[in-house]
Amino acid sequence: MAQTLYDKLWNTHVVHTEEDGTTLLYIDRQLLHEVTSPQAFEGLKLAQRPVWRISANLAVSDHNVPTTDRSHGIADPVSKLQVDTLDANCDAFGITQFKMNDLRQGIVHIIGPEQGATLPGMTIVCGDSHTSTHGAFGALAHGIGTSEVEHVLATQTLLQKKSKNMLVKVEGQLPHGCTAKDIVLAIIGKIGTAGGTGYAIEFGGSTIRALSMEGRMTVCNMAIEAGARAGMVAVDDTTVEYLKGRPFSPQGVEWDQAVEYWKQFKSDPDAQFDRVVELNAAEIVPQVTWGTSPEMVTSIDGRVPDPEKEKDPVKRDAMERALHYMALEPNLPIESIKPDKIFIGSCTNARIEDIRAAAWVVKKLGRRVAPNIRLAMVVPGSGLVKAQAEREGLDKVFTEAGFEWREPGCSMCLAMNADRLEPGERCASTSNRNFEGRQGAGGRTHLVSPAMAAAAAIEGHFVDIRKLG
């Protein structure tokens, strides 16, 4: 019987299935960070249980770490406690961890792939919503809760019910100035934040296959914002080439065997999906969110929508509330919106490809950050990304233009550290969520690509980067 990629990943990890469909799945890799792991480790200690498979776990602090000078440690006592607790727990249980001042430290969903700890055919979990990122490698990856983190630590298994299959097929040549971020925002704009509820989404088509692994990770990262349990892309030569020679990747003869095994992780030609959504890449335009949900998105050459034109009363009320919170008027041209702050970073867009794209725009425009921009910051996704960017001189491109070049971490993606918006401040952000208060109480978030964020920093308002040439 023909199988989808999701079917294959699921079926190769089933330990046992109950009559009601509840399935015990084997988990190949668990990634840990400081926010959702303390209670899990405490549960193990209270029950006097060991970690079942120590080598299957990899930990890093990312949510609470400062992105400025780290020589004085962490100022906030709560943040410091969480980071110190992860350090102590990993030391006690023997789990590999990249501590705050380790060059390999970074955002958990960036360090996993760059270390080769994320591999095709794996089941991967983490106590974090955006674990779907790792599905870009032909893996089944999704976020879990703290009690489930403990369960995986203790048993290397997880109770799950199988999702339905969805294929999002994007075909054609992506226009100049458009990126993976624009693709996924366009997808969410089309199907909505509940469009993927109950599904695991496979992203396919010629446009997706043409993306780099960085681009594929951006798309899969935001599958959760479409309501999906997981997002994934089939294995191909791009996948294999990215993983070759990475520290956790198989080596020698084992590498050859692994590559042969990975080749199966793609949907069979005649596999059936429960839902298929198609997009024409040629019609995708640089995207900007205007509201308080990723589905509230439009093109850079568009206008803020008018709630009065929405027939659905529930949607109309949501639009009115969003516009009030965002302090925007209906029919306002998107290009006239002026951010106060610029954030280039997060597990969505803080890889070397993203940093290069933003730097290219800054060099192309050849000017400094606009006077109305209070802060423009670039936060690399890991110490290794930061080091690579510095070898290429990209840090100088930013700092000479008036940007701040920071240390790696989750930073302004969420208000859980020192990097945050003040009430009423507006931010052009390359992150994944624009909910009320996400970047700070009363903060207003517009989700965009790194290139779009960089252009807004220089021009002082959103601009259509397709015009840069």
UniProtKB/Swiss-Prot annotation:
GO molecular function: 3-isopropylmalate dehydratase activity; 4 iron, 4 sulfur cluster binding; metal ion binding
Binding site for [4Fe-4S] cluster: C347, C410, C413
Keywords, alphabetical: 4Fe-4S, Amino-acid biosynthesis, Branched-chain amino acid biosynthesis, Iron, Iron-sulfur, Leucine biosynthesis, Lyase, Metal-binding
The reaction(s) this protein catalyses: (2R,3S)-3-isopropylmalate = (2S)-2-isopropylmalate
Signal peptide positions on this chain: none
Xref: HAMAP family: LeuC_type1
Lineage, top ranks: Bacteria, Pseudomonadati, Pseudomonadota, Betaproteobacteria, Burkholderiales
Organism encoding this protein: Paraburkholderia phymatum (strain DSM 17167 / CIP 108236 / LMG 21445 / STM815) (Burkholderia phymatum)
Transmembrane segments: none
Complexes and interactors: Heterodimer of LeuC and LeuD.
Protein name listed in UniProt: 3-isopropylmalate dehydratase large subunit
